[in-house]
Structures are given as C-alpha cells and as structure tokens.
Amino acid sequence: NESKETIEKEDFVKRNSAIYEGIEAKNINIKIIDYEEESLTVKYNTAFDTVAGKVDFKNEVAFLEQDDQYKMVWSNSVIYPGLTEDDKVRVSVIQAQRGQILDRNGRMLAGKGVASSVGIIPGKLENRKKSIVRIAKLLGIKPEDIEKELTAKWVKEDSFVPIKKIAKVKELDLLALDPDETIVEEQKRQEKLLKISGVMISDVEVREYPLKDEAAHLVGYVQNVTAEDLEKHAGEGYTNASVIGKTGLEGVYEKELKGENGCKIYIADSEGKEKEQLAYKIVKDGKDIKLTIDADLQAQLYKNFKSDKSCSIAMNPFTGEVLAMVSTPSYDTNAFIMGMSKKQWDRLNKDKKQPLYNRFRQVWCPGSTFKPVIAAIGLQSEAFTGTDNFGNEGHSWQKDKTWGTYHVTTLHTYSPVILKNALIYSDNIYFAKAALKIGTEEMERSLSMLGFHSSIPFEIMMAESKFSNNKHIQSEVGLADTGYGQGQVLVNPLHLACIYTSFCNDGNVLKPYLLYKENAKAEQWISEAFSKSVSQEVLEGIKSVVNDSHGTGYAIHRKDMILAGKTGTAEIKESQSDTTGTELGWFAVMTPDKKNKKPILIVSMVEDVKGIGGSGYVVKKDKAVLDKWFGKN
C-alpha cells in the first residue's frame, strides 16, 4: 500500500518502460542470488544488453506479507541501486565520423567540409514579414518555409534558427587574380543577407564533394535518414541525426564508411549532472575508402564531354584498375547536401538531357567498336582466317533474295578485302559476312562466354550486356547485323573496355576493380577467352585503325607511342529507310605496350552525333584527353 501511494500504476509502467526502451534493453536475465527469510529480503542479479553494451548489477528488494501474499516494497532503487525519484537514466550518442572517399593519390572525393548556415535570431528580426520575404528570395525558398522553422516549439527569441545551408565563400578564392564569377556572386548574396537585421551566417560541418559535377554519378551523395531508412535499417546503429549513402559509392560502401556510433548510458541527477555511468560503447569512425580513380583524369574527361550526353570509362589495360567513370551531363552533388528547393529539383529532374541519368551503368548499341570482338570470335572459332579475302561487294550487299529489300551498306571500298583492311576501313559488309561464317550457335556461345547476359563482377552494379532481347539471335539478318554491332546488340561501356583488355593480355579478359591496391596485379575475369595468337592478330588490326592514314581513328595517332583503337557509329532508327534516327558515336583507344609508363584504355560514347562528325567527334574529344594525360606530342 505504501508503494502504491508513492507511485501510481500508470507512472510506474511509464517510468520503467521509458528507461528500458530508451536504453534498448534486450535479453533481460534476472537471477536470485539469496533470500533472507527473517527480513523477507531477496538479493538478485540483473543482466541485459543495451545500445551501449552489457549492463550487469546486483541489487536487493524487501517484501511484506499482507493478506497471505508477499508484496514488493517498491522504490526507484529497484530499477537500479541508488536511483532516486528525481534521477533520470540518460542515453548519449557519440556520432561516428564518416570515412572519406579518396582517389588513388589521396585526393578527397568525399569527406568533411564546411558550409555556411544561414539562420535567424527571431528577437532581432525587424519588419518580420518583409524581411522574411527578402530572405526567402535571396535563398531561393518560400517565405512559408522560413515561418515554419521560426514557429517550431523549441524556438525562443534569442535562438539561432538554421534556415538553409549554402556554399562557404573562402577568402583565398576571392583573392585569386581572376576569381570565379559564381564565387563573387555568392559573396554578394551573403553580404545582402547579412544586411538584414536578425540574420546570422555561421560555419557548419557538412559532407563535401570537391569534384562536384565531375564525379557525381560515380561518388554519389548522402542524405539525412528518413523514417523509412530507420525502419529498414533497424538495429544497425542509425539515429535521427544520421546520414546514409543514397547513390553511387556513398551507397555501395555505406557499411564501411558509416562507422559505429559510440554510446553512453548514465544516471543524471535533477540538475542534469552525471552521477554514475552504467554502460559505454566506444565510437568507431568509418573507414576511408581509397579508389583506383585518378581525379585529374576524371575531371578532364568530364570537362571535354560536359556539353554532350555521354559516358566514358578509363582503365589501366594491364591491371584492370578503373581510372575514371564519367557520365554527362551531370549535377553538383553538394546541392543535395545544402538542401535543394522544389524549383531546383524540378529543373534538374525535367531537364531533357537527363543529368541525373547514369549513362555509364547502362547498355548501348556499340556499332563498329564491336567489330574487333567479332574478329576475335571468328579467328578463335576458325570460321575464317585473317588473310581470307571476302570479295569486294561495293557499297551495298545482301546474301540472297530471301533478305527482301534489306541490304548491308558500307562507306568505303578497298582491296584486298581481308581482316586488317576491314578494321581500318570499318567495313560493315565484311563483318556481316564474318558473322554469317561464325554462325548463330557459335556466336551465341562465344558472346555468352564473354559475359553477355551475365552480370559484370564489379563493385557498382551495371546493366547486363546482351546480344538479343531473348538470349537467341532470331534471324540470319539479325546475325549479320550483330557482326557490325547493330541488330539487338547492347553493350555496357565497362564491359566493352574489359573485352578490349584481352587484346593486350594474351587473350585474357581482365576483371575491373575500384578499390586501390598497392602493387596492383591483374585478376582475370575470363581466362583464355582467345588464344595469344588471335588476340595479337586483332591487336595489330586495331593498331592500324589508329596508325594507318586511312584508318577511321587516325586523328588520334601519336609520334611518341603506338596506340590501338576502334571507332563506332551506331544507328538508332526504326527501319533501314528511316532518315530521322539518331546516332551514337563511339571510340575505344588504348596503349597496347606494357612498357608505357602511363597505360590507359578509354571507351567513350556520345549520343546524337549525327551531323557533327559521327565517331570522329568522339575521337577529337578523346585526343584532347590523351594529350593532357601524356603531355602534348
């Protein structure tokens, strides 16, 4: 009865529940140690797991005999020895520092940065309505959004109420001889904000992406956790204050980057001072992720293609290290960290060029960049030899009348019609015939062996390359079209780059990877895809594409080294007679010499190259990248 007078049943349940739920108590085990019959005292041991680790303590409680029943003499100390009515059990979370994402040279791609937090002190805000409208206009948000923040329950007259994060203007950037115009404009905006009474701008720690647009699709970004995230990742250490990787490598390496929050459970007195620590879990900061990516190359590829709808993959052709992964157009990932307005989001989301679309993860019609692959399959299967003359058919050819009005066309005639020349002149007719000689069964078997209709063993999930919509080439015309990279063939650019590694690695297709390793060594994805002699013969052919003056890739040839490569222009149209279709321009280029000090393989694809030079447009762009990579020849 005395216990009931001390605390109501509802309050008893509420206090106990609040404590045990707050510390996330699990696996509760209470064991009686001793019982003193004379004093009716029970000694017991309590043990349970919490968010901060194991709690284990001894305690005792007295009982009274009333109405032939034993009843507990309850007090707060039953919950924990020494706990009083005014004490609180508190949980303090120590947030783990998120790991950095670094390039191969230690340059930060994602990590700790500083932004400016624009806030308002309500008590100092003069002409409230007009000031809020002006602040909203300068920040690109709605006045009602500001009002919502200012009327939150916790806000007092002297509170600093954060409204929006914006880019921090660094003095060094302003002192440059020719400061960036956007930085100057940002400085002017902040000066206007500070002239409004009650506005303050302070530094705030944020996740920063120094390469901005240049690596957005690769690195990705984090955002504050949502209720859905907390539900989905329950028990994984996320709190309302956590961020989580949403896209790109921020998402792929979320587990490694996030670390483990530290936690302390303690008893606080009525003034909030710590009386006793019950449990403590040490904070474990997230791991840094070092990539094979070269930030300078990543930036250079982006700058050269930023006005196009394109994607580029760069690799070391002898190790499988991925040096760059670029998709354009792009977006500044920092905008997601600062907080994007609906207007900004709509503009980004409705842009016809689709800057949010990650093109390097997709599959595309490869056009003539597929011809070296067909050449290797034909030689490997002994369907033909490199010296077999396929005969000069002019600019148009069909196998027989069963093809109806369908003809394969090509741009150039030459002699003799052998493999090396067919690669130099990018002869569609030669490779259509080559595909027919290979045959449907062998073509499907070989392409399946090369990873078509299978996933690429890579950290980032890529769309699967395919040679047909249903894993079977349906017709003779479809087979012929496959020979020059048309028909239903769709290839992921990383996959194509991997297949090209076989031409300078004795026929072995290398496995691509992103995590940096000291003294990198190649790992084979597909061993002996082609024989050494076959890969060498194809390599000589694609060397000629770049180094023979008639070659479609001759514009990129260099005097200081030998390059190998293949151009491609893929037609995207409804029928052979369609003149309104678009074209994809491709170029694959690499350094085939293992002695080269800066080995590189680049595969680039640009949409809508019709009327601007086809694949030649891409060759010029990649030439500028290689000139920067090697130093102009």
Q: What residue spans do the PLM features occupy?
A:
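Membrane-interface anchoring segments and C-terminal beta-barrel signals
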Residues: W586-D593, A624-L626, K632-N633
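Core segments of small alpha/beta cavity-forming domains
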Residues: N1-I19
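Short beta-strand segments enriched in hydrophobic/aromatic residues
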Residues: Y44-F48, V222, F503-C504, T591-P592, ...
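A short acidic/glycine-rich loop-to-helix N-cap element
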Residues: E607-K620
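Solvent-exposed, polar/charged alpha-helical surfaces in well-ordered, non-transmembrane soluble domains
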Residues: K14, K129-K137, E191, A216, ...
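Beta-lactam-recognizing serine transpeptidase/beta-lactamase-like catalytic domain environment
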Residues: A268-A279, P317-S368, V373-S604, G614
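Extracytoplasmic/periplasmic proteins that interact with beta-lactams or build/remodel peptidoglycan
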Residues: K14-C311, Y331-P355, V363
